[in-house]
Design a protein with these regions (language model features):
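Canonical tetratricopeptide repeat
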Residues: 69, 102-103, 136, 170
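C-terminal motif of bacterial Sec signal peptides marking the signal peptidase cleavage site
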Residues: 2-4
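Structural marker of alpha-solenoid helical repeat scaffolds
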Residues: 58-62, 92-94, 125-126, 159-161, ...
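Structural signature of tandem alpha-helical TPR/SEL1-like repeats
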Residues: 45-51, 76-88, 110-122, 145-153, ...
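Bacterial signal peptide processing site
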Residues: 6-9
């Protein structure tokens, strides 16, 4: 396969597989490519994942940015086998933390926590300054019962994300599971963590320790 060759994403076959033979690891750098990706990201941000997938499938798949979104959208629309196939091929061909992250998240959706941790740890090492990767790795560590390590990863993600997003709840859950009152106080003083958020974190805490390893 020649890197940089544009191709349309293949239709899913009756066996439920996708053709990944034209995967390329190059970044999408052309202005029209960036416009395409921004439009797809906007749909994803609104939760319109089926529409985003349809839009993506109408575009040439001429860069890793397209394939990463393709795998993510396949997973978010319930096509986990196809998503896993895309991400595994990306991992084989591209040394990229985002590919490992995607594969780890597919494993997490399957409730395969240990398999997810393997890939998310590699993603974390490849992309140490990614708040999303550190958050998702920390969340998987919570599911595995590794609360101290999870708290470190999630606090790092919180700081990288400037205190915004779902990591707020995750780090609070980690502190609750560890009985870390000092950490909870820091969330209140440093990041304006409210009592309502704390109550919600207490409710979320009940789900941990129940995942199959």
């Amino acid at each position: 396969m020649l890197a940089g060759c544009a191709s349309q994403p293949s239709q899913t076959t009756p066996e439920g597989t996708v053709d990944t033979s034209d995967i390329t690891c190059q970044e999408a750098v052309q202005p029209e490519q960036r416009v395409d990706l921004e439009m797809i990201d906007t749909l994803m941000g609104k939760g319109r994942n089926h529409a985003a997938l349809a839009r993506l499938e109408s575009k040439p798949m001429d860069g890793i940015d397209y394939w990463l979104r393709y795998g993510q959208l396949l997973a978010s629309t319930g096509k986990l086998d196809d998503a896993e196939q895309v991400f595994r091929e990306l991992v084989l061909q591209c040394v990229d933390g985002r590919s490992r992250h995607g594969l780890g998240m597919v494993q997490l959706k399957r409730n395969h926590v240990n398999a997810a941790l393997l890939h998310l740890e590699i993603a974390r090492n490849l992309s140490p300054a990614s708040a999303q990767v550190r958050n998702d790795y920390g969340y998987a560590l919570l599911l595995a019962g590794r609360y101290q390590q999870a708290a470190f990863e999630l606090r790092t993600a919180l700081e990288l994300a400037n205190g915004q997003g779902p990591v707020r709840q995750n780090v609070a859950v980690a502190y609750l599971l560890r009985g870390d009152e000092q950490g909870l106080d820091a969330l209140k003083s440093d990041y304006g963590f409210s009592e309502d958020e704390l109550d919600y974190a207490r409710a979320l805490r009940q789900q941990f320790g129940k995942s199959e390893q």
